[in-house]
Amino acid sequence: MNATITTSEQARPVFPFTAIVGQEEMKLALLLNVIDPKIGGVMIMGDRGTGKSTTVRALVDLLPEIEVVENDPFNSHPYDPELMSDEVREKVHRGESIRTTTTKIPMVDLPLGATEDRVCGTIDIEKALTEGVKAFEPGLLAKANRGILYVDEVNLLDDHLVDVLLDSAASGWNTVEREGISICHPARFILVGSGNPEEGELRPQLLDRFGMHAQIGTVREPELRVKIVEQRATFDENPKEFRQSYETSQASLTSQLTEARARLRQVQTDYSLRVKISQVCSELNVDGLRGDIVTNRAAKALAALEGRTSVSVEDIGRIITLCLRHRLRKDPLESIDSGEKVQEVFSIVFGTNPL
């Protein structure tokens, strides 16, 4: 089964990101991961037909093009050694010139039936032994380097494959070892998983590895439902004209994201706020330090998105539920929703009203 790779030549028109109505939590989580991929991806859980796949594809269409080494299966960065394949890195060390081109940020769909070899890549052992060369067939992780790897119904994916994806997403590298032969290549991507909670949850150990967890539901307001239906009908009738009507807002958001990524390094969080973030994590009995780290990163990304260089209490309040709700221990006797519990503790520690 082949993966679907989104390219600039893609025939199917994509619904504009700025035209998507509602689902603010999901959209914010995706934008923050684009600004700082080290947040660690996002898990989107929600009902069927709530726009999960549409929003992810719309995000990719929104992103600016990137410069890559020509004819390189790993989308190697021409100047950053951490994002180069071994072959490109060796050429650079030898002082050889490399040709570059620009391309849309890749989006790779991971099919549910994918095998580990299809995901990680394979080594041709026979060719390696007879010809003495490392014959490597890149997998989906190679294609997703510097892009987005999207797994729909990730809660139905084999746990071992989810582990492989999360390991690569965290380290930025994929290592394939067969019969004493080892190949390593960059695999730095934003991992986006989506699923329907009715079809089962991820194991807590795996869920904790996702940076953020967005919950979305079916829109209930009749007026909003009518607006969504009408927008979709207009898009289906004339996609080109519909997309043109959102060109200005799309370009504005693309520019905002580019500026936010450049601004991110300048953003600072006061020590007192960092202590309070850790206090919230401690009082919620969050295991490990991932929650602290991700919350700090996400708050900085939000400040950068809104054009500021310092994190505010409001920034933390807007993202802390996204960063912590999936890290709480499940208590069968607990009646309060995990997101509400996070906001409750946040308001006590920070002395604010719950958002």
Curated annotation (Swiss-Prot):
Record comment: activity regulation: Redox regulation; active in reducing conditions, inactive in oxidizing conditions. Thioredoxins f and m mediate the reversible reductive activation of oxidized CHLI.
Protein residues bound to ATP: G46, D47, R48, G49, T50, G51, K52, S53
Gene Ontology CC entries for this record: chloroplast stroma
Annotated keywords: ATP-binding, Chlorophyll biosynthesis, Chloroplast, Disulfide bond, Ligase, Nucleotide-binding, Photosynthesis, Plastid
Molecular function terms, GO-annotated: ATP binding; ATP hydrolysis activity; magnesium chelatase activity
EC number(s) stated in the UniProt entry for this protein: 6.6.1.1
GO BP: chlorophyll biosynthetic process; photosynthesis
Family, per entry: Belongs to the Mg-chelatase subunits D/I family.
Function: Involved in chlorophyll biosynthesis. Catalyzes the insertion of magnesium ion into protoporphyrin IX to yield Mg-protoporphyrin IX. The magnesium-chelatase is a complex of three subunits, CHLI, CHLD and CHLH. The reaction takes place in two steps, with an ATP-dependent activation followed by an ATP-dependent chelation step.
Name of the protein this chain belongs to: Magnesium-chelatase subunit ChlI
Gene (name only): chlI
